[in-house]
């Protein structure tokens, strides 16, 4: 009645019927991989075309499929029906959370972003990895590897995080306790790698930067990219699984050394007086103004028939009830000189930067204050010292 107000986010709740059977894909993935690696033939006598040729198996997923790999592991599907392992190694890339596969009316996916399915079921699964992880917000115990640790079927596990995961996808609870007061010790079979100064979608290089001033406040994208890093780490995972070669230690921001902080503690340098080409015309970039926006992480109650620690059951309270207890969100601290983050794996573009790659952006819609989904920002350096001093830009010049 009277139309929609763009200042609000609307969620439609309705009575549905005839839910599909969901979660079968987890069993299908388990049984398919197990068949190819260890069976001579299927139950109909059809020969396995690669019987005896597979010595090790690696599973990899990016973003939503990475979340699904974590759900696969969390729910115990890395134990084959014969008791053996399904995957010897697993790499969940830019995958901060889990996904909604195992509930009635499940909708696999769900962004969990501020304006992209903020109350997705996949938000309720444990973020901590360790089998003894204690969630002090919900009071629940047990992390992602709890089931596989019980059955001795845990894979060697890599988790990769871009910078956007911290701002928009609540990435920090995998690194700290739920209240954000101490760094977590990670399982021996796991490594976590933070790709410094990157956005969720990768890209990289100045050619990947686009600027639509009516859509985003700053040029969209990050020159810093994780593509080469991801490939190198995947080979490290293979070496760990196949040859027993220890991979690099986890590289993440930490509370202990001041590289993981509350959003309000960030300290960016002044970035002023720059332009970027829009349709062949040099267009002014607004002077950078840090607003401290991030996607919060409240504890939701979906009703007594929903089992959050199993990502299972029936949601009877929709929209879910906000219990008023939020998980702490922390973000990587930046270098006061360049604005690039201080921790994590720094690619060539971060070691020899052409400007500041920022892990978030803001929408440019008048009257709306919000993060620009999963995109980052790029603000170039001035070409000369004289130009940057005249503009009041505190960063180095090219």
Which positions does each model-derived feature cover?
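C-terminal His-loop and adjacent cap/lid subdomain of alpha/beta-hydrolase
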Residues: 1-398
């Amino acid at each position: 009645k009277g139309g929609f107000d763009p200042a609000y986010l609307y969620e439609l709740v309705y009575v549905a019927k005839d839910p599909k059977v969901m979660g079968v894909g987890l069993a299908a993935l388990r049984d398919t991989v197990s068949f190819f690696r260890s069976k001579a033939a299927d139950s109909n006598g059809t020969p396995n075309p690669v019987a005896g040729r597979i010595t090790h198996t690696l599973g990899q997923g990016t973003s939503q499929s990475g979340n699904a790999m974590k759900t696969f592991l969390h729910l115990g599907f890395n134990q084959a029906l014969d008791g053996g392992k399904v995957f010897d190694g697993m790499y969940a890339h830019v995958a901060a959370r889990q996904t909604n596969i195992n509930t009635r009316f499940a909708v696999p996916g769900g962004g969990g972003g501020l304006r992209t399915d903020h109350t997705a079921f996949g938000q309720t699964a444990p973020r901590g990895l360790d089998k003894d992880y204690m969630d002090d917000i919900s009071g629940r115990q047990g992390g992602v590897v709890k089931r596989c640790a019980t059955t001795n079927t845990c894979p060697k596990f890599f988790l990769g995080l871009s910078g956007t995961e911290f701002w928009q996808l609540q990435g920090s609870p995998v690194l700290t306790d739920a209240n954000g007061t101490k760094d977590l010790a990670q399982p021996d079979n796991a490594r976590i790698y933070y790709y410094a100064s990157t956005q969720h979608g990768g890209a990289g290089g100045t050619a990947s930067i686009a600027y639509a001033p009516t859509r985003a406040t700053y040029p969209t994208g990050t020159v810093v990219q994780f593509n080469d890093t991801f490939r190198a780490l995947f080979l490290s995972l293979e070496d760990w699984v196949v040859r027993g070669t220890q991979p690099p230690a986890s590289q993440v921001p930490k509370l202990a050394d001041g590289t993981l902080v509350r959003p309000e503690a960030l300290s960016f340098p002044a970035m002023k007086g720059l332009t970027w080409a829009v349709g062949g015309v040099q267009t002014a970039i607004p002077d950078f103004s840090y607003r401290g926006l991030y996607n919060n992480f409240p504890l939701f109650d979906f009703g007594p028939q929903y089992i959050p620690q199993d990502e299972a059951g029936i949601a009877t309270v929709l929209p879910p009830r906000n219990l008023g207890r939020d998980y702490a969100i922390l973000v990587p601290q930046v270098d006061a000189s360049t604005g690039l983050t201080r921790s994590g794996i720094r690619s060539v573009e971060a070691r020899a930067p052409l400007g500041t790659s920022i892990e978030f952006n803001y929408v440019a819609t008048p009257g709306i204050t919000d993060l620009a989904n999963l995109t980052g920002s790029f603000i170039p350096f001035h070409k000369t010292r004289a130009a940057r001093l005249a503009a009041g830009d505190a960063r180095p010049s090219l």
